[in-house]
Amino acid sequence: METNTENHIKVREARSYARCIKLGLSTAADHAGVVWTHTWPSVLLSLVLPFPGLIIFIGQLDRLLCEWSELGFVPRRKPLEGWRMDAHRSMRALVSLLVFVFIICVIGSCTWAAMVYLPHGKLMAMAAMVILTLVALPSVMMTMEVEYSDSPLPVCRAGWLTGFRHYGSLLAYSLLLFMINLLIMLAGTFPMNIVTMASTQAWQAALAGDTVMTPTMWPLAIIASYIIFLIFTFSAITVTAFCNNLFWGSIHAREAEKKQD
């Protein structure tokens, strides 16, 4: 199904976090063809160069979702200025990714310091990791603001306060979405794990001096497992983006209702 002007889905509408995820999953599944139409260059690039390819894919997807926020429906055709907007959104997606990397580095460094320098190191390290993760959780809302709005990057820092005000919904939403993505990625890595285990056993047997007969189609199996992994990765990113866009719109709708009251 492709969204048209007769089938509007308003993004900025107050919804529960569970409703955002349910609607995000169904909308992402219904518009898989539209997403492919808008993002196929980055998908093909990711098969060869995963890192820049995935960033460009996220940028193209964010641009599509921003148009959905403005129009009320997911546009089937890409606008003429779409490539320029793709580059703009890819840069904002890269900024969002760098924020996540910075937060992970800070949490990891503090966890390591707690384990090394504090008594009961392992216990204190676990406590530090949990506490810092909960403190940093509102940053998720800030990264959504970076990806789905046109606000200048310094202004997007206010998204942290927005996430703090809606901390309960953000925590429940993040945990549920994390479990869904975990299931998707476990399914995607299953073929690759089988291929890796078989390759490791064959390599160990060869080192032990045994004669190992490698199937003729084995290289194709390795390539197929890699492609399957990328497909599931794209699926997880797409589901996350659709759900995040709806959750971001829902939070903004709640904020607008509070201001009116």
Predicted features, each with a name:
Residues S109-L118:
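Juxtamembrane "helix-exit" motif on the non-cytosolic side of transmembrane helices
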Residues K122-L134:
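Alpha-helical transmembrane segments
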